[in-house]
Amino acid sequence: KDIPVIWVDHGFNTPATYRHISQVVKHLNLNLQVYSPKMSAAHYTAVHGPIPELDTPEHDLFSRIVKLEPFDRAMDDFKPDIWLNGIRHDQNDFRQDLHVFTFGSHDTVRVAPMFHLTKAEVETYISDRNLPDNHDYYDPTKGEEHRECGLMKRV
């Protein structure tokens, strides 16, 4: 409970994801610190339209607004030395070249404890320990399962 857990709520989550977050916080008694974009999802959509097509300057701006800026704010507020994340080496080509310990943005050491696990091993771990799971997660900054949202590529 003493360790702050940062969650960037980009505002485009599914109802199942919001329920999942509530379950996880309650189940694990987390000290969740929620960071949201300065512009809500409804505001963004009203001003800019729907989520932009991938690999466009508009999508890059979208990612900065809804994911990268709130993350930067959280990192500036907490100034952590260590950034724990849940990436795995088998998620995409970019991540295959990373390691369990890497240097990250904001002068952090990124630690990926599940880096060498497969998706099946993670699912077994979750199931064996009766942990809440969310199969309905969608990250609009990635758009597709094997893309990056931008956080891991920043140094």
Task: Specify the residue positions occupied by each region the protein language model found.
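Nucleotide-activated chemistry modules centered on ATP-dependent adenylation/adenylyltransferase
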Residues: 1-155
